[in-house]
Every structure is written in structure tokens, then in C-alpha cells.
Amino acid sequence: MKKLLYPILLLSTVALAACGTTEAAAPAAPQPGTSGINITAQQNRVRAQKVDAVANLVPKAVRDTGKLTVGTTGNGTPPLSFRADDDKTVIGVETDIAQLVADVLGLELDLQATSWENLFLSVETGQYAAGFSNITVTEERKDKYDFATYRKDTIAFEVKKNRDVTVKEPKDIAGLKVGVGSGTNQEQILVRWDEQNKAAGLKPVEFQYFQNTTDYYLALQSGRIDAYAGPNPTAAYHVAVDGQTKIVGTVSGGGQIPADIAAMTKKGNGLAEPLRQAVQSVLTNGQYAEVLKRWNLGNEAVEASRINPPGLPRK
């Protein structure tokens, strides 16, 4: 029987990692869950076939190595890039997509687990050909890196299963007690929403802050907060393993601006286009959808991979 995971997560890990301000930290000790999500080292990943027309686009310097060296923050939070139950093997949606891309390019995936800061440095110096680690496209990052998108950057609102509430726009959170991580991207968005609501004469949001995700979920179950706003992948994973909550709305990680998660490579090295075409290949043939479904992230699917789309604005 597959072993299962009920993660105790740090909210800011994914959110700040996507914004590029901190290293992804390891989750605390897991406890049994009931989701059926495979977190063993034997992943039986979805695989793709080599596509010669795409593989031939890979720069010679990379092609000659026979490997696609990919950096990822392997001590991150489920379901992105995290350690399996052997506490060694790096698994998650990010590694699954990297595997599909390597397959299409006809290269062996050489996955390197590293810190968030070292990931960017190693891609910039060429030590890693690419980074797959929930990396959001930003205008500032585009100065040094090229990007090929493969997932939407999304924030989710999670509530108890018996709550009759939907969150689609600012007025939907007026008067609610909302748990959100201090200093996170989602907090910035909700503070702007709250300011709009108060200007329109609506009740203010009562923001609640806790030390870690476990505390947010305890507050949610006890009724101390009405909703919890956090990274969609984390919320989707928790809904799957816990079974007592539901997602009632999502918003772009850029607020009013669409935000994208992308494979990152050194600017101008010629790898961005083959990365994009590899993503597009598995997107077209359905293997991409299989991977997202496996990790309950179907709502973050993109219709097409793009190179260097508009990113989050400079601060």
C-alpha cells in the first residue's frame, strides 16, 4: 500500500519562494493522511517520448552532455518539490514536469536539490541548465533569465466544508475573519481588497496571523477564522489529504495582473525555446494534464507555454 502524507507546512515557504524573497524551508514531520497521493520514492512518473524536432533545438553545449541539469528546492512544501517518505528522493509536480520536458528533449533528467538563493545563482552561471521550482515570472528576473511558462500562479481561499461562501472579488471578503501569512504576496493583495471595500462603505476584513500553517487550519476548524488565503498548490494538497475543507475561490498571484510559473534558464543561452516547445508538446498530448491531475492542480493549467510573458512589475 502506498504511504500517505498529511503535511504540516509553513505558509510563507511557497508564497515567498514564488516571489523570490526567501529560501524554501522543509516541512515539519508528517502524519498519516487519507488522500491516496503517492509520496513514496517509487513515483511511477508520467513519461513522454522524445520529439526529434524539439530535441534538435537544444543548444549543443547542453545536448552533448546528454543531461538536462535542473535545479529545484527539494526541501519545499508539498505538492511542489519535496522529499519522499525516504527523506531523500525529491518528488512533486515540479519534478514531474521537469521529467516530461527532459523526455521530450531526449535528455536524462539530472535533478539537483538546492537552496532558493543558490538555484538562481547556479542557473545564472550555467551550472544548472534550468530551474523548475515554482518560480514566478517577474520583470526584474527577466533582466537575467529567460522563462518558458507551464503553470498559473494562483492564490486560493480555503474554508470549512460546511461554509456557504464564495470568493471571487473584494466584496466577498468584507467583514470576514481571514487568515493570511504576514509579509506574503497574498497579504498584499487582500490588504488592497480591504482598502477598496472600506472606501466603498463595506465592513473591514479582520486579518488573523499565526506562526505556521497548522495553526491556520486549527483556527479554521474551530471557527476563529472564516477563511484562509494561501498558495493554491498548498491549499489543494491540504484539501486532498484532510477532507474537512474546500477551496471556494482563487485569484491570480499577481492580483489584477496574471502571474505565471515558469522554467527558468540563463538569458540568451538558446534553451528557452526548446523548453517552451517541450512543454507545449506534453500539453498537447495530454501528459501535462495527467501530471497536474495527479497533484490536484488542474486549475493551474495553462493553455499554451509562452516565452518571457509580462511578469510581475518591479517593486
What are these regions (language model features)?
Residues 152-159, 240-280, 298-315:
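Periplasmic-binding protein-like
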Residues 75-77, 88-103, 135, 153-212, ...:
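Bilobed "Venus flytrap"/periplasmic-binding protein-like clamshell domains
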Residues 14-18:
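C-terminal motif of bacterial Sec signal peptides marking the signal peptidase cleavage site
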Residues 135-142, 190-193, 221-222, 226-257:
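A ligand-binding cleft/hinge motif common to bilobed small-molecule-binding domains
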Residues 59, 90-94, 141-151, 248-250, ...:
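A structural signal for short loop-to-beta-strand junctions that line the ligand-binding cleft
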Residues 29-132:
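Extracytoplasmic small-molecule ligand-binding "clamshell" domains
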Residues 108-172:
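Acidic, polar ligand-binding/catalytic clefts
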Residues 20, 30-53, 95, 103-104, ...:
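Extended ligand-binding regions for polar small-molecule ligands
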